[in-house]
Amino acid sequence: MKDFSDFFRNPHIWDREIVAVGGDLSPERLLYAYKNGIFPWSDQPILWYCLDPRSIFDLNKLHISKRLKRKINQKRYTITFNRAFEQVMRCCAYRPGEDTWITDLFIKSYTEFHKLGYAHSLEVWDENGKLGGGVYGIAIGNFFAGESMFSFIPDFGKIGLFHLFETLKKDHFTLFDTQQLNLVTLSLGAYQIPKKEYLKRLESAVASGKKWNPSHFVL
């Protein structure tokens, strides 16, 4: 892995959230960043963050309502992995009347990261084959960073997240990073931990460096 330690501040000792400004979104830089607890927001210029506190999910404690559980069990949908990565990103970026950090530069760069086996998507299709929801994120070793999700059909994003959790548990993932807490992730059970604890858990989770191949799961 290429060394970018001269570009990024060391998040173990740097006490500010922004650890670098500028650079590019090359696969090598993204891989180094995520393995060290750093992620990019915005692209004019690119700002690189390591937040304190950090928001994570416990993979065994996703909050699912009884109504949503019934909808999940009805199985009026199909789940796929990595079938429409760029489309999922564009759907996540589609927010009429709102700004989005998922710009064309991010879509192009993360699609390249996807082709290298580090970025992944989960798609939720309705009974007519329409893409109704999805999630995408980064997987390294036993670490997953959830980047964004969308629902064009009510609850399909949450259904996708449920199946993502189940799949990650089967593949022995140990850390699910949600970066920053918001109302949606909070309602689903996300919580915050100190950066120091997060970085310690991250180091263990990414240690193997293995790429994830979820295609063997049939949902």
From Swiss-Prot:
Catalysed transformations (reactions): N-terminal L-lysyl-[protein] + L-leucyl-tRNA(Leu) = N-terminal L-leucyl-L-lysyl-[protein] + tRNA(Leu) + H(+); N-terminal L-arginyl-[protein] + L-leucyl-tRNA(Leu) = N-terminal L-leucyl-L-arginyl-[protein] + tRNA(Leu) + H(+); L-phenylalanyl-tRNA(Phe) + an N-terminal L-alpha-aminoacyl-[protein] = an N-terminal L-phenylalanyl-L-alpha-aminoacyl-[protein] + tRNA(Phe)
UniProt xrefs under Pfam families: Leu_Phe_trans
UniProt keyword list: Acyltransferase, Cytoplasm, Transferase
Gene Ontology molecular-function annotations: leucyl-tRNA--protein transferase activity
EC number: 2.3.2.6
GO cellular component: cytoplasm
Subcellular location: Cytoplasm
One example of a Gene Ontology biological process annotation: protein catabolic process
Enzyme class, spelled out: transferase
Family the entry assigns: Belongs to the L/F-transferase family.
Function description: Functions in the N-end rule pathway of protein degradation where it conjugates Leu, Phe and, less efficiently, Met from aminoacyl-tRNAs to the N-termini of proteins containing an N-terminal arginine or lysine.
UniProt-listed NCBIfam families: aat
Protein name: Leucyl/phenylalanyl-tRNA--protein transferase
Species of provenance: Leptospira interrogans serogroup Icterohaemorrhagiae serovar Lai (strain 56601)
